Amino acid sequence: MANRGPAYGLSREVQQKIEKQYDADLEQILIQWITTQCRKDVGRPQPGRENFQNWLKDGTVLCELINGLYPEGQAPVKKIQASTMAFKQMEQISQFLQAAERYGINTTDIFQTVDLWEGKNMACVQRTLMNLGGLAVARDDGLFSGDPNWFPKKSKENPRYFSDNQLQEGKNVIGLQMGTNRGASQAGMTGYGMPRQIL
């Protein structure tokens, strides 16, 4: 963000809205998980959005994180090296994003490289890391480190199987959208305009 001037008007309002979505409590949970999950010592940043961004900005921590979710020798990011060059840092971030997508994160849940590198949308970075953690817990392959309660529980598939007889019986049931054949009916009523028969 050093090369960008201040935002004004609508751009400023949009940026402020995005910045309000950032969760400081979630930041602490993510830092705790990342330091636990990484096999190497990746350090620990001071609290704050900018410190969190600077910690993740060069991509080495993210690459160590995604490698920690795979067994030894099957790491998706082979070469991790700290660099001060902008393009090297962005390349490592994009390697993490590609590996996260292969791991199973939806493309719509993944942040853009500039969201992290320029600090444009750190809330989106948090959401991606939360989805990654939740998916790692749901996989239950023994490679997740940390407390599973840090992440929302993913729903599991619960298929229903019906026999042919059950499916055939279902065709005989009148759906409630069609009305019902029980309860009040017009049985015993006289037609319109006819006199009532009182006996």
Swiss-Prot record:
Pfam family membership, one: CH
Recorded superkingdom: Eukaryota
PROSITE patterns recorded: CALPONIN_1, CALPONIN_2, CH
Modified residues (N6-acetyllysine): K17, K20
Listed InterPro entries: Calponin-like, Calponin_repeat, CH_dom, CH_dom_sf, SM22_calponin
The keyword Transmembrane helix belongs to this UniProt entry's keyword annotation: no
GO MF annotations, alphabetized: actin filament binding
Protein name from the UniProt record: Transgelin-2
Gene from which this protein is expressed: TAGLN2
